[in-house]
């Protein structure tokens, strides 16, 4: 768990283009040079579609991670917060806050409390316009949504999957997390986080994004998990790599007399070169780094909160 006084916050009035974001992230490097430091990025304008969100998060997590890795900072966790202006009311405390120079953000200093405040350099309002991507307005479209995964050493790809899930869900998010006994054949299995630890990190990240959302974490012992038992579920969120499992889920639900689920595919999750991602995101790679690390207390992709 990251110490509160090691957190750094960036507030962005727009989603900046790649070169601008790289420079902004570079400005945080002096403040992040410590083990288990944490970078939170808040995007102020609301996203209207999950397609837009998926695209923006994929680019921003990838660029931010690349900059940090370029400085050898594999231990810095990243959280991108969106559609949650009330984050300033949370109990989080930031050691350093980078704000736009516009006067409209001066009042944020009162709400964010103590900390070092710096103006974002190399940033101009004309630099960026939030990318317009066609797609239905689907914020809070489903009352009850489900997703599943191992969520070992929660990383940027996991966070994109969870972020899109919270975006399309209005009331209840059910997350199946693979139980320990099904992970015995994984590489570097001795470094897999215990089930309770993985649950805690997932819960903390979801609550950071959407505090009012009801979250249910359940052990995943088969392909269907809660989707094969809970009739109220309306949508299943999957990655491209796991989309075939959705067919099995819906076949099982129909056989049991339940309605089939809408399937929402998250296009950018990690591990595929065509997405601009690489294996730097995988839980297996994180465990490999841990195994070879001379400083095991500094966890790569350290969890969010």
From Swiss-Prot:
Miscellaneous comment in the UniProt entry for this protein: Present with 3610 molecules/cell in log phase SD medium.
Record carries keyword Protease: no
Broadest EC class assigned to this enzyme: transferase
Cellular component aspect of the GO annotation: CoA-synthesizing protein complex; cytoplasm; nucleus
Organism: Saccharomyces cerevisiae (strain ATCC 204508 / S288c)
Major subcellular site: cytoplasm
Superkingdom in the source lineage: Eukaryota
Catalytic reaction annotation: (R)-4'-phosphopantetheine + ATP + H(+) = 3'-dephospho-CoA + diphosphate
Protein name, per record: Phosphopantetheine adenylyltransferase
Listed EC numbers: 2.7.7.3
GO biological process, one term: coenzyme A biosynthetic process
Family assignment from sequence similarity: Belongs to the eukaryotic CoaD family.
InterPro entries in alphabetical order: Cyt_trans-like, Rossmann-like_a/b/a_fold
